[in-house]
């Protein structure tokens, strides 16, 4: 259970709002190239403003050392355009001028403080051992100590960063109630429903290059009997093909180069345990000197070219399985979709997902980008705003932000 914007009277209250508006930026002009995440959090910002709250937005852009690590001035302008409301950029984060700007706010006013990653403590957190990074420890960081006295509530709407434990994401919860924003609320409701109470048949389609993450999801959803079947593609499929005894030549070297050799043994165990619930391609599209050449997969014949997509017979097989599914969760592209010669598998997978009889969920990251490219994003029931956060949630992992939201509910529930 989590606290939401509707649980408290927010008029006249100063609310810190953490969002994820990390966006692609033209490094030459500073222009924002894709405002998807900015649009996603607009409902939360507007709701808070209309409730009469003084809205202080905290956000990050890229990280130190990257070419797109910059101020949030362009983000404030874009937010103003999207909201049709003035969003004032404050050229500071914890300095006196930033604190004075907060004190001078009127009800309903919106300001955006500077990039939180300008503070070293925000990028030095040990994300891998987050359970040791308690709110108490993060509450002792400079940013939290400087800013928390100005806030009555902390709203977290940064689902895309929910698997992180930086001060700006969890530190304020030690001092004030931590609430879900609209994006966070929708993500948690949708993904929890998919994991705990899906309509059946429930089919997961897992692909992409981050095979270890996808295999963790596969294991979790089969172990907990969430999924009735899992369709594999991309590097994930190649690992399961090797586990089944297929000889895929240079593609095995790719698996090794990516550090996924250990995943083959895991795949063998999963095949032994779940059998036909794990579906692998029956043909593949090979990259033969830049051309697409389709070939059926045969246990007795070695593949000698890179596999860059699933073949048409696999597309048909997956379409047949997906058309009657009542819940479909897809994460990761089916192949090298950036190359138009190998886009077809991903496009057909997305079409089959959109045309299924049930509720469709697309994980964030590359597959959501592909859905935009082929014009199918609008046909999905839910496209997650979080790539890594979404897949870790589906894998059954504890996410720092979600844990803190749950603890805040227990501490402050009405």
Swiss-Prot record:
Signal peptide: none annotated. Its EC number is 2.7.2.3. One of its GO terms (molecular function) is ADP binding. One of its GO terms (biological process) is gluconeogenesis. It catalyses: (2R)-3-phosphoglycerate + ATP = (2R)-3-phospho-glyceroyl phosphate + ADP. Its main location: cytoplasm. Substrate binds at residues 20-22, 37, 60-63, 117, 164. It holds the Pfam family PGK. ATP binds at residues 338, 364-367. It is found in: Cytoplasm. Keywords: ATP-binding, Cytoplasm, Glycolysis, Kinase, Nucleotide-binding, Transferase. It comes from the Archaea. Transmembrane segments: none annotated. One of its GO terms (cellular component) is cytosol. Pathway: Carbohydrate degradation; glycolysis; pyruvate from D-glyceraldehyde 3-phosphate: step 2/5. PANTHER family: PHOSPHOGLYCERATE KINASE, PHOSPHOGLYCERATE KINASE 1, CHLOROPLASTIC-RELATED. Monomer. Belongs to the phosphoglycerate kinase family. This is Phosphoglycerate kinase. The lineage of its organism: Archaea, Methanobacteriati, Methanobacteriota, Methanomada group, Methanococci. The gene is pgk.
């Amino acid at each position: 259970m989590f606290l939401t914007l509707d649980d408290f009277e927010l008029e006249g209250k100063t609310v810190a709002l953490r969002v994820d508006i990390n966006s692609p930026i033209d490094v030459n002009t500073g222009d924002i190239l894709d405002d998807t995440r900015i649009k996603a959090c607009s409902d939360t910002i507007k709701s808070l403003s209309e409730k009469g709250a003084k809205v202080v937005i905290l956000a990050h852009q890229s990280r130190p050392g990257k070419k797109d690590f910059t101020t949030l001035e362009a983000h404030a302008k874009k937010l103003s355009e999207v909201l049709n409301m003035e969003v004032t950029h404050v050229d500071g984060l914890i300095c006196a001028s930033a604190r004075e700007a907060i004190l001078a706010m009127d009800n309903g006013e919106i300001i955006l403080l500077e990039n939180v990653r300008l503070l070293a403590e925000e990028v030095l957190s040990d994300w891998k051992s987050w359970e040791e990074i308690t709110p108490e420890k993060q509450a002792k960081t400079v940013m939290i100590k400087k800013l928390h006295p100005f806030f009555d509530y902390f709203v977290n709407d940064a689902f895309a960063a929910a698997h992180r434990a930086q001060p700006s994401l969890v530190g304020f919860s030690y001092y004030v109630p931590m609430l879900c924003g609209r994006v966070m609320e929708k993500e948690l409701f949708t993904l929890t429903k998919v994991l705990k109470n899906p309509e059946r048949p429930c089919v997961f389609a897992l692909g992409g290059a981050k095979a270890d993450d996808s295999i963790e999801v596969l294991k979790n959803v089969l172990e907990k009997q969430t999924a009735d079947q899992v369709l594999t593609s991309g590097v994930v499929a190649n690992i399961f093909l090797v586990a089944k005894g297929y000889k895929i030549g240079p593609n095995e070297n790719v698996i090794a180069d990516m550090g996924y050799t250990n995943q083959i043994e895991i795949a063998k165990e999963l095949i032994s345990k779940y059998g036909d619930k794990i579906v692998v391609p029956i043909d593949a599209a090979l990259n033969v000197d830049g051309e697409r050449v389709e070939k059926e997969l045969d246990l007795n014949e070695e593949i000698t070219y890179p596999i860059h997509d699933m073949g048409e017979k696999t597309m048909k097989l997956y379409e047949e399985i997906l058309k009657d599914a009542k819940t479909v969760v897809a994460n990761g592209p089916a192949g090298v979709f950036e190359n138009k010669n190998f886009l077809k598998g991903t496009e057909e997978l997305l079409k089959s997902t959109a045309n299924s009889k049930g509720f469709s969920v697309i994980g964030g990251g590359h597959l959501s980008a592909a859905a935009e490219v082929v014009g199918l994003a609008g046909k999905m029931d839910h496209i997650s705003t979080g790539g890594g956060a979404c897949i870790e949630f589906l894998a059954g992992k504890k996410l720092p932000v979600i844990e803190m939201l749950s603890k805040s509910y227990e501490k402050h529930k009405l």
